[in-house]
């Protein structure tokens, strides 16, 4: 069975069977995807996280299919209907749809019209009709009039019910319909009478009809959401006449009276059984495809957001802006610890701008503030303007930071545990400041679904979504690595091989014993075994460790290689890291071994060049157009700076400094054809856009990047 799985996955993914086998062996041995991708390149042939995850997903699906086959075989055997040919066919089938078609005639059913007819003894009559040789079926039917069968017509009706069920369970018939649905099925949506006003936001779909195979995922999910809310009635249908004709060609072999009875049964089978069944199947398949696309977009957006550039360890002031309630101000040290908080009221209706400036000046001096993070919610632009009009004694950079999800964090158990004496406004301002310092460390504390970069996220398969987002967070955290001595338990949870319990044990050990001085010391943490250490060690950094390799992505299992390199050059490891000329003398091929190949050696040399390097780029200061405050200030043709706030499969939304985000449709991202917006833009990217259209009533803004100078 294992080899069959390897062959099938290799064929699907275009990856060699050897790579599949080695990867599955590592996964089954408890290795994580980030660990395999980073430290087992020789075994996998250099597969990345996406490929390894795909192997894992297909393997899990095949295992599920294997379990389903076992259930089907057992059920048919219990009925005493299993034959060697049938069992062989089930065992050789791995397509879920085909498997269910094979099983359908044997599947236990609630009482059907066909079953009721069989109990009346009408199956022999159905067989006579299907042979289509009897010239007078009514006369033959008269012989079945007894008991609950009232007359010949009643007998024929029961026989047709049996035939209809046989037609609906026929594999060839089902495949005929599937092929027709696949080619020509049309998705139709119509508004439910009386729901026009309530469902106004769905008015684009009130009377729409389009090819199912061409319907984009965002449209399909919007239509399905409206259907769930009772606003739309939705159907999927091919050409009914063509479908019936195809079925009749298969089952009706005579123009006589029996043939007409069979034709009537075929029409009933299509309308009552087959069409609803295949429609349900296609509805589920199209929904699954749309879910997968939406989840892919969400995961990519989340990845870009988590890997946004950090300001780093600077002393930051966080401001959660507001009008009537004032602006909540917090001051943090370079490690993100809260030092001070208070309110200022620079805006209407209070208008205490002088007092606000004096307070800010005092805080900036007292806490040696180096940067200010302003939340991008209510009063954000006004607060930014107020700050930029002031002259502080210290040079401070001003940044606008997304507040999305900050309110969720501020009311969370994590925030309450850290700041039990402070209210949600203080916690929210702290989150804004920390997002500027290190977006990854801060955002992992928030449910990804609350961050606001998804597309119909509440409508997709929630277990699939959670799995994908959790894996995305894990990949990002391990790509960057974390400081073992400052990382929160929540951040450590996502490190390869740890999880919640070991993460908390590390934090507890740190609290009791002080900072870790080496990676080896991890083995003293309760419940830290050799396997967990192997999986996590390379992703944990100790900046001031005695061994400089403890602050790199070089795995402890490879320290001996670096030590040998240093020894061969007559220097220490620290000197090797510090001296580029020494590193240039290294001949990597000298250190090849049966377990260490060039991929690992190249990674080691890259780490020695930039120890503990952060893959995230440097942060950039950004300013919105000062003349644009509301949607009413926009004019067609106006060019504006903006920040990409969300990406969907139909385009990108851009924050241009007002309440409403504008949309750059896929066709307006570039002169060339673009199939995926991620080819052109990324989350939080700074862009210049031109206004194409403004709908003030519907609060919609159309943007373009074509013909606009790139930032």
Positions of predicted regions on the chain:
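Structured, non-catalytic alpha/beta "coupling" segments that mediate domain-domain communication
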Residues: 75, 89, 99-103, 226-239, ...
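Single-stranded RNA-binding regions, centering on S1/OB-family and related RNA-binding modules
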Residues: 542-711
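Long, highly charged, low-complexity intrinsically disordered interaction regions
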Residues: 2-5, 64-81, 91, 417-515, ...
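Duplex nucleic acid-engaging cores and interfaces of nucleic-acid transaction enzymes
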Residues: 51-54, 61, 65-318, 324-422, ...
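A glycine-rich phosphate-binding loop feature that marks nucleotide/adenosyl-phosphate handling sites
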Residues: 179-187, 319-323, 377-382, 401-408, ...
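Short flexible coil/turn linkers enriched for glycine and charged/polar residues
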Residues: 16-17, 29-30, 96-97, 122, ...
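Short, ordered loop/turn segments at secondary-structure junctions
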Residues: 39-41, 130, 239, 321, ...
């Amino acid at each position: 069975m294992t080899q069959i799985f390897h062959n099938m996955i290799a064929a699907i993914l275009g990856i060699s069977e050897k790579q599949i086998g080695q990867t599955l062996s590592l996964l089954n041995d408890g290795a994580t995807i980030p660990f395999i991708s980073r430290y087992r390149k020789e075994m996998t042939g250099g597969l990345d996280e996406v490929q390894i995850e795909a192997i894992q997903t297909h393997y899990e699906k095949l295992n599920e299919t294997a379990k389903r086959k076992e259930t089907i075989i057992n059920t048919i055997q219990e009925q005493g209907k299993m034959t060697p040919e049938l069992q062989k066919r089930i065992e050789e089938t791995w397509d879920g749809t085909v498997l269910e078609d094979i099983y359908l005639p044997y599947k236990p059913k609630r009482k059907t019209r066909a079953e009721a007819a069989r109990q009346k003894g009408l199956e022999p009559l159905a067989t006579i009709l299907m042979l289509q040789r009897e010239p007078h079926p009514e006369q033959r039917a008269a012989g079945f009039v007894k008991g609950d069968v009232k007359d010949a017509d009643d007998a024929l009706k029961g026989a047709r019910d049996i035939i209809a069920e046989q037609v609906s369970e026929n594999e060839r018939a089902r495949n005929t319909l599937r092929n027709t649905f696949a080619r020509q099925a049309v998705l139709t949506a119509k508004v439910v009478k009386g729901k026009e006003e309530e469902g106004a936001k769905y008015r684009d779909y009130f009377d729409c009809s389009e090819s199912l195979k061409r319907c984009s995922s965002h449209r399909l999910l919007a239509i399905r959401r409206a259907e769930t809310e009772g606003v739309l009635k939705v159907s999927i249908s091919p050409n009914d006449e063509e479908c019936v004709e195809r079925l009749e060609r298969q089952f009706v072999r005579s123009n006589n009276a029996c043939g007409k009875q069979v034709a009537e049964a075929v029409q009933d089978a299509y309308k009552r059984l087959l069409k609803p069944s295949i429609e349900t199947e296609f509805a589920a398949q199209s929904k699954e495809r749309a879910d997968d696309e939406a989840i892919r977009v969400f995961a990519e957006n989340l990845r870009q957001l988590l890997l946004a550039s950090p300001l780093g360890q600077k002393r930051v002031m966080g401001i959660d802006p507001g009008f009537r309630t004032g602006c909540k101000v917090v001051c943090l040290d370079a490690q993100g610890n809260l030092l001070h908080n208070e309110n200022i009221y620079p805006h209407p209706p209070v208008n205490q701008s002088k007092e606000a400036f004096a307070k800010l000046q005092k805080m900036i001096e007292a806490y040696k503030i180096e940067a200010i993070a302003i939340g991008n919610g209510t009063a954000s632009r006004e607060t930014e303007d107020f700050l930029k009009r002031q002259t502080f004694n210290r040079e401070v950079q001003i940044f606008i930071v997304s507040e999305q999800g900050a309110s969720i964090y501020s009311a969370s158990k994590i925030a309450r545990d850290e700041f039990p004496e402070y209210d949600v406004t203080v916690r929210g301002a702290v989150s804004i400041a920390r997002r500027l310092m290190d977006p990854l460390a801060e955002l992992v504390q928030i449910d990804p679904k609350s961050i606001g970069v998804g597309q119909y996220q509440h409508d997709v398969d929630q277990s699939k979504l959670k799995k994908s987002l959790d894996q995305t967070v894990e990949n990002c955290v391990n790509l960057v690595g974390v400081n073992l001595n400052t990382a929160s338990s929540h951040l450590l949870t996502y490190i390869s091989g740890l999880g919640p319990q070991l993460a908390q044990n590390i934090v507890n050990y740190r609290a009791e014993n002080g900072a870790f001085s080496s990676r080896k010391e991890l083995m003293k943490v309760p419940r830290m075994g050799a396997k967990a250490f192997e999986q996590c060690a390379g992703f944990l950094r100790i900046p001031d460790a005695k061994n400089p390799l403890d602050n790199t992505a070089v795995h402890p299992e490879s320290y001996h290689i670096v030590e040998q390199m240093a020894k061969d050059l007559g220097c220490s490891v620290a000197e090797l890291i510090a001296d580029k000329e020494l590193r240039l003398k290294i001949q990597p091929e000298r250190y090849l071994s049966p377990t260490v190949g060039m991929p690992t050696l190249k990674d080691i040399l890259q780490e020695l060049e930039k120890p503990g390097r952060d893959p995230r780029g440097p942060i950039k200061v950004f300013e919105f157009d000062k003349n644009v405050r509301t949607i009413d200030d926009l004019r067609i043709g106006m060019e504006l700076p903006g920040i990409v706030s969300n990406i969907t499969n139909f385009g990108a939304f851009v924050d241009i400094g007002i309440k409403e985000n504008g949309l750059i449709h896929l066709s307006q991202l570039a002169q060339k054809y673009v199939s995926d917006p991620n080819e052109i833009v990324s989350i939080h990217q700074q862009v210049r856009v031109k206004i194409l259209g403004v709908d003030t009533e519907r609060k919609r803004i159309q943007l373009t990047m074509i013909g606009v100078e790139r930032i």
